[in-house]
């Protein structure tokens, strides 16, 4: 039976706090998830270069196919990325380009498509021109 993966969010730019989270949860075999805040922080990129276990990189990449593919190429040295996110709104060509480049980083990488941000609701979607309700997107 395949076990479900459980992730622990390391949503901080404080390197000491990230290390504390990882140390307190390592016996549970959780996979750390690093988002934009940590990745762009002073120590984020350097920490991930040296991190020896698999991790989830939650960057929610969103741009034209060539740009997201090039952005992934620039993090090719982060070999322990097991999961990475891309906004599904990049379109089919963007998703294909992203996955193709992601597999060059790690042959077993899992690309997760983000369809909608959890912070959005029907009203906020209407404000940015979406006509459908959240459940339909």
Question: Predicted regions span which residues?
Answer:
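Surface-exposed amphipathic alpha-helices with a cationic face
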Residues: 23-26, 48-52, 95, 99-106
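Conserved alpha/beta-domain cores
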Residues: 10-49, 59, 65-68
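Conserved anion-binding
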Residues: 2-3, 63, 67-137
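Hydrophobic faces of well-ordered beta-strands that scaffold small-molecule active sites
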Residues: 4-10, 30-34, 55-59, 82-86, ...
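Flexible, charged surface loops at secondary-structure boundaries
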Residues: 1-2, 25-27, 49, 77-79
């Amino acid at each position: 039976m395949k076990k479900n993966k459980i992730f622990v969010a390391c949503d901080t730019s404080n390197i000491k706090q990230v290390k504390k989270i990882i140390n307190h949860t390592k016996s549970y075999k959780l996979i750390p998830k690093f988002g934009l805040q940590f990745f762009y922080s002073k120590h984020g990129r350097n920490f991930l270069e040296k991190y020896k276990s698999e991790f989830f990189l939650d960057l929610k990449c969103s741009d034209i196919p060539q740009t997201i593919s090039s952005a992934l190429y620039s993090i090719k040295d982060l070999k322990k990325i097991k999961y990475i996110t891309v906004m599904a709104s990049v379109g089919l060509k963007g998703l294909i380009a992203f996955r193709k480049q992601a597999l060059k980083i790690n042959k077993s990488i899992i690309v997760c498509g983000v369809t909608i941000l959890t912070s959005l609701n029907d009203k906020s979607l209407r404000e940015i021109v979406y006509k459908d309700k959240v459940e339909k997107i």
